[in-house]
Amino acid sequence: MESIAYVLIFACLIGLFFFAIFFREPPRITKK
């Protein structure tokens, strides 16, 4: 059960990290 909590925290941290980068640096290449 502990592993699930760790994975959740890790995913949240990664998500916040990418979110901060996206807001700090707008994507130069606007291609999907």
Curated annotation (Swiss-Prot):
| Keyword line | Membrane, Photosynthesis, Photosystem II, Thylakoid, Transmembrane, Transmembrane helix
Q: GO CC: one term?
A: photosystem II reaction center
Q: Name one GO biological process term.
A: photosynthesis
Main localization of the protein? membrane
Task: Please report the record's description of how this protein sits within the membrane.
Answer: Single-pass membrane protein
Q: Where in the cell is it found?
A: Cellular thylakoid membrane
Instruction: Give the protein's function.
Output: Found at the monomer-monomer interface of the photosystem II (PS II) dimer, plays a role in assembly and dimerization of PSII. PSII is a light-driven water plastoquinone oxidoreductase, using light energy to abstract electrons from H(2)O, generating a proton gradient subsequently used for ATP formation.
Assembly and binders:
PSII is composed of 1 copy each of membrane proteins PsbA, PsbB, PsbC, PsbD, PsbE, PsbF, PsbH, PsbI, PsbJ, PsbK, PsbL, PsbM, PsbT, PsbX, PsbY, PsbZ, Psb30/Ycf12, peripheral proteins PsbO, CyanoQ (PsbQ), PsbU, PsbV and a large number of cofactors. It forms dimeric complexes.
Q: Which HAMAP family match?
A: PSII_PsbT (MF_00808)
Q: What is this protein called?
A: Photosystem II reaction center protein T
